Regions:
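Active-site scaffold of zinc-dependent metalloenzymes
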Residues: 3-59, 72-76, 80-95
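Short alpha-helical catalytic segment bearing the HExxH-like zincin motif
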Residues: 60-68
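Short, basic alpha-helical nucleic acid-contact segments in DNA-binding proteins
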Residues: 95-102
Length: 109
């Protein structure tokens, strides 16, 4: 796994990086390995279809990273049932930028 950065999840350090083989083995764009404290995503060029724009691939990659970080937050909180709920995790990952914008507009962050 190519190490890109460390992310603090509720006081626990996760290592985030890319590993196409690990993701492809799980038929996923990303993985959150709770016990290994790793967040893994596909490389940018492997996101979406080969003919997708780089901008679209970057949007998808950021969404996948958010998705895996949310899995980690639920796991570190002991909320494994929520972490296993892909619909909930995906909804938060997709909507979070809009929620953050609304929170900032409301001056409550």
């Amino acid at each position: 796994m190519e190490i890109k950065q460390k992310i603090n999840i509720l006081g626990t350090e996760y290592v985030a990086g890319t590993d196409d083989e690990a993701c492809m083995a799980m038929n996923a764009d990303g993985l959150c390995k709770y016990y290994e404290k790793e967040i893994i995503v596909r490389n940018l060029e492997k996101m979406l279809d080969p003919d997708s724009s780089e901008e679209s691939k970057l949007i998808r990659m950021k969404e996948v990273v958010r998705h895996e970080i949310i899995h980690a937050f639920f796991a570190e909180s002991g909320l494994f049932d929520y972490s296993d709920n892909e619909q909930l995790v995906n909804w938060i990952a997709i909507q979070f930028p809009k929620m953050l914008k609304a929170f900032k507009e409301a001056n409550c962050i």
